[in-house]
Curated annotation (Swiss-Prot):
The lineage of its organism: Eukaryota, Viridiplantae, Streptophyta, Embryophyta, Tracheophyta. It is a lipid-anchor; GPI-anchor. Disulfide bonds join C78-C114. May act as a carbohydrate transporter. Its main location: membrane. Glycans are attached at N40, N71, N86, N99. A lipid is attached at N138 (GPI-anchor amidated asparagine). This is Early nodulin-like protein 16. It is found in: Cell membrane. It comes from the Eukaryota. Keywords: Cell membrane, Disulfide bond, Glycoprotein, GPI-anchor, Lipoprotein, Membrane, Signal. Residues 1-24 form the signal peptide. One of its GO terms (cellular component) is plasma membrane. Residues 139-167 form a propeptide.
Length: 167
């Protein structure tokens, strides 16, 4: 029974230490206009912040366009040759996982789409740190953190449960 308590305490500790407040966002490229020609995707992206583990969701006419990743030079010249990645999966509903902090250069290499404006460049950044909690002037000076909780409660419980099994 005590071993179960140790396992439960360990599982709770692992869960609390792994929990984060950061969530990835799925961006529909072009919003309700989707991935189509004659849309300025530079303007669409200019007021957005793309963070690590966000997703770009491309919706387009599958028989006419595609989504490929190219280098900056090929992005500028709308050259689809030698792509870094082809994100098209054939259904016209493609996701690009922004899993590295860097520039991503995406174009449509089919149907002259890139020349019609179907090109998107985004810079992926690390997420900002969570905001610091404002101090409460009306209460005693107490702070709560996952690590403080772990050291003050979960670890003693786990130690007690482990020692309790020997006696």
């Amino acid at each position: 029974m005590a071993r179960v308590a140790v396992l439960v305490a360990g599982a709770v500790l692992a869960f609390l230490l792994a929990a984060t407040n950061v969530t990835a966002k799925r961006w529909t490229v072009g919003d309700n206009k989707f991935w189509n020609p004659n849309i300025n995707y530079t303007i669409w992206a200019q007021d957005k912040h793309f963070y690590l583990d966000d997703w770009l969701y491309f919706v387009y006419e599958r028989n006419q366009y595609n989504v490929i990743e190219v280098n900056e030079t090929n992005y500028i010249s709308c050259n689809p040759n030698n792509p870094i990645a082809n994100w098209s999966r054939g259904a016209g509903r493609d996701l690009v996982h922004l899993n590295v902090t860097r520039h991503y250069y995406l174009i449509s290499g089919n149907g002259g789409g890139c020349y019609g404006g179907m090109k998107l460049a985004v810079l992926v950044e690390k997420p900002p740190p969570p905001p610091a909690a404002a101090p409460n002037k009306n209460s005693a000076r107490r702070t709560f953190s996952v690590s403080g909780f772990a050291y003050q409660f979960l670890i003693p419980v786990a130690v007690f449960a482990a020692v309790g099994t020997r006696y």
